């Protein structure tokens, strides 16, 4: 028996030392514009608790660049070993990098530029035998072209956050109407010269979020969800014991390997009189605007994002910034519940001292248009957080009560998106002789789709389209004058689709909830009819004002919307006079005699169209029917030791709808618009813009 045991033991596999792992960014296959700046980071990782890999060597195109590592020496004197960050006091401060885990050895080089088009190869090795090789494709965008070739002096990119094809169709139906099966008019987006389809996936997920969705358009590089203008690295700040919230401040959130933004690249190559403008209906530190100027691994790091708009303006070229988010620009007061910056910095005052004209209301913004020349730089902060949506601004006092409360009196004087767009164009066209890049976001299309609120989402699409019309009118003037250097390229697109919005039918008045007093599924008339029902007319019958907004969101034949990526929710087919969450994931319970809010699986919110809804329609409640959701709701549960946070997405109950991976439409007008036909990746949009805007 002893001999047998020995023989068996000899046959058992002998554990081998854990192999070092190497990660390189930019990732293999990245397409990089010739001369565009980017950072290279190489991370060699040993076993947790073990020694850091030794002898990290980095070779680019056959040339050893290991010595260019900006990280401090670690144990043994090797740069970047033991997780060392940049040396204390490293300058410039924006290039500093935080420490990484001690079982890693890292390489970091900032602001690399590859001028020669073609394939470039980087190989990293360690003394332990680990190796990684990546190849990048560098494309030429500065090649000479015939004098008649299209070129864009200005670029206006309008992004409807979450704006899928169905939402465009819905806005057309409500804003223009249909007669005898044909649309009575077109949206501004419909009139653009070329349309294509964009694939939207992020670096690490089939379904993107807004941060990489935007930054892919303007860097040409993929980014991971929640990140903007950067690649992932291993310096993410660890959570303190018992900490559940994601860190929102600190060097590690702003030290990731960067990729140069379109506006910064054009400013660097065109000259310092090239300017950048960012306009949004969201908080200006939100993912989409920030993903045009600020590099961070956490889209939620609002205070630091706001600071970098100003502190890095010589690089980002920012001359116009408008939207909500005033709380991130003023110091926090001592009043309970008051918003403001924890660091006490008066960023609003600093912007003004830097030459920005600051406005805080629609009245003040309109006054700029009557006071002579447009200001050279413009900061508009019209809300403490995200701006009020179009449905509640247009419908105030009619079909919306959102702004009726005295507590919201100060929010009644907010501009519409098209007004902000006009003001931005006035400043940029007057003070940016080297051209400009303007991003305009219809932000709350997405936010209201997350809330499974069809009316508020569609109203925001109509508002967004009115901003598109302003951009097209501006381009029509510049593209027909005698100056070929001020021609304007206009693009209208989305970062992703939200909610899986589908147009399921039109309400059959026979089963209208207003008539029955409750909602039924039979109200949703579908496409199948009998031969003797040809006289039925089931098209939406909205009346609309001069701007295209319906005057009543609940006509007898309203457009009905369904959702493929929603939580559980109640549906009564009627517009909500107040914005109310579709589902909840918390409950108030008694613990030791105290009322405590505890996390729960997401469930339909009975306060919106459900059994506890106190809203009225025509003086009475109209209870809705329960619609079962399909996305993760946190009901399964998983012990933390079995589901670490970096692997489990269902730990947080999702009480809103999710994004989807559907391709999104992109429409273009102006010089080179035809190059945007077809189906292409979001990173390819960057290259197509650059080839047009880089020709001067």
Regions found by a protein language model. Give the residues of each.
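Short, aromatic- and glycine-rich surface loops/edge beta-strands on solvent-exposed regions
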Residues: 118-128
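Extracytoplasmic mature domains of secreted/periplasmic and thylakoid-lumen proteins
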Residues: 221-319, 329
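Short, compositionally biased P/S/T/A/G/V-rich stretches that sit at domain boundaries
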Residues: 18-36
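Surface-exposed, short loops/turns at beta-strand junctions within beta-sandwich domains
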Residues: 111-119
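Aromatic/hydrophobic beta-strand junction motif of beta-rich domains
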Residues: 40-48
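Edge beta-strands of extracellular beta-sandwich domains
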Residues: 130-139
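A post-motif C-terminal structural segment
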Residues: 74-95, 107-109, 153-154, 163-220, ...
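Low-complexity, Pro/Ser/Thr- and charge-rich linker/hinge segments at domain boundaries
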Residues: 138-158
């Amino acid at each position: 028996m002893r001999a047998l045991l020995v023989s068996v033991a000899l046959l058992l596999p002998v554990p081998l030392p854990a192999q070092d792992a190497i990660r390189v960014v930019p990732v293999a296959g990245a397409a990089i514009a010739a001369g565009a700046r980017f950072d290279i980071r190489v991370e060699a990782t040993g076993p947790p608790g073990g020694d850091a890999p030794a002898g990290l060597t980095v070779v680019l195109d056959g040339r050893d660049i290991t010595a260019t590592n900006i990280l401090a020496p670690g144990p043994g004197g090797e740069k970047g070993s033991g997780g060392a960050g940049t040396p204390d006091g490293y300058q410039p401060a924006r290039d500093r990098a935080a420490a990484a885990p001690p079982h890693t050895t890292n390489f970091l080089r900032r602001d690399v530029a590859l001028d020669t088009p073609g394939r470039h190869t980087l190989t990293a090795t360690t003394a332990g035998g680990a190796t990684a090789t990546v190849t990048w494709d560098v494309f030429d965008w500065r090649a000479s072209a015939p004098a008649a070739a299209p070129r864009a002096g200005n670029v206006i990119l309008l992004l409807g956050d979450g704006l899928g094809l169905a939402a465009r169709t819905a806005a057309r139906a409500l804003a223009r109407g249909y007669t005898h099966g044909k649309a009575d008019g077109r949206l501004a987006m419909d009139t653009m010269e070329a349309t294509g389809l964009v694939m939207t996936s992020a670096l690490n997920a089939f379904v993107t979020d807004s941060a990489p969705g935007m930054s892919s358009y303007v860097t040409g590089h993929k980014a991971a969800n929640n990140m903007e203008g950067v690649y992932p690295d291993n310096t993410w700040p660890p959570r303190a014991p018992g900490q559940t919230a994601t860190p929102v401040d600190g060097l590690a959130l702003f030290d990731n390997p960067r990729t140069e933004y379109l506006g910064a690249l054009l400013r660097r190559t065109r000259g310092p009189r090239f300017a950048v403008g960012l306009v949004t209906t969201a908080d200006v530190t939100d993912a989409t605007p920030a993903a045009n100027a600020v590099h961070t691994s956490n889209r939620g790091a609002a205070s630091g994002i706001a600071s970098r708009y100003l502190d890095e303006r010589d690089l980002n070229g920012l001359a116009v910034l408008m939207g909500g988010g005033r709380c991130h620009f003023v110091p926090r007061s001592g009043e309970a519940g008051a918003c403001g910056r924890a660091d006490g910095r008066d960023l609003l005052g600093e912007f003004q001292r830097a030459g920005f004209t600051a406005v805080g209301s629609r009245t003040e913004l309109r006054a700029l248009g009557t006071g002579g020349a447009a200001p050279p730089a413009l900061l508009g902060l019209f809300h403490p957080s995200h701006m009020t949506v179009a449905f509640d601004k247009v419908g105030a006092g009619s079909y919306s009560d959102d702004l009726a409360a005295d507590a919201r009196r100060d929010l009644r004087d907010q501009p519409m998106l098209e007004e902000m767009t006009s003001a931005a164009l006035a400043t940029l066209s007057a003070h940016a002789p080297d051209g400009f890049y303007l991003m305009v976001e219809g932000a709350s299309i997405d936010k209201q789709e997350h809330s499974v609120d069809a009316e508020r989402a569609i109203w925001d699409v109509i508002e967004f389209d009115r901003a598109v019309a302003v951009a097209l009118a501006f381009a029509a003037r510049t593209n027909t004058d005698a100056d070929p250097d001020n021609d304007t390229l206009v693009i209208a697109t989305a970062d992703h689709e939200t909610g899986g919005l589908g147009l399921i039918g039109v309400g059959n008045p026979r089963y209208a909830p207003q008539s029955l007093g409750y909602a039924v599924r039979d109200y949703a008339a579908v496409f199948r009819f009998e031969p003797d029902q040809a006289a039925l007319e089931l098209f939406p019958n909205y009346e609309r004002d001069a701007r295209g907004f319906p005057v009543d969101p609940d006509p007898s034949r309203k457009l009905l919307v369904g959702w493929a990526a929603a939580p559980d929710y109640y549906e009564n087919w009627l517009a909500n006079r107040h914005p109310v969450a579709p589902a909840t994931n918390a409950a108030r319970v008694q613990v030791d005699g105290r009322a405590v809010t505890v996390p729960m699986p997401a469930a339909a919110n009975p306060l919106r169209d459900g059994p506890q809804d106190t809203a009225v329609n025509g003086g009475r409640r109209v209870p809705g029917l329960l619609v079962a959701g399909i996305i993760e709701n946190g009901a399964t549960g998983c012990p933390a030791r079995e589901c670490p946070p970096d692997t489990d997405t269902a730990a947080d109950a999702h009480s809103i709808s999710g994004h989807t991976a559907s391709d999104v439409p992109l429409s273009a007008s102006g010089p080179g618009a035809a190059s945007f036909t077809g189906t292409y990746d979001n990173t390819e949009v960057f290259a197509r813009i650059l080839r047009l805007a880089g020709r001067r």
